[in-house]
Amino acid sequence: MAVLDYVLGEERSRLKRYQSHLEEDAAGLPKGSISIKIKSNHPYAYLTFREGGRVISKYIGHAESPAVSELSVKIGDRRRIVKELQAVKAELRRIERMLRV
């Protein structure tokens, strides 16, 4: 049983390091989504996100600009990281339960 406890402890510490790494990565990326609004037959992009209890729309630029596509990639990266972070947290809870038994 000592070997199993050791392996689970090592996996727990590895997952905690990975969790902090993912949290740092997610903190550096924008959250929210891009919404397109049409004014005078011209599409404009806005970054829409929540701050506190309010919904904020921040102007990015023309919908076809490179800044919009770059921001879209960053938002996609953040969503992927957050999904991975949820999986890591679930695995940590599972390991914690195994160590308690």
Task: Locate each region found by the language model.
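A positively charged, amphipathic N-terminal helix/segment that binds anionic biomolecules
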Residues: M1-V101
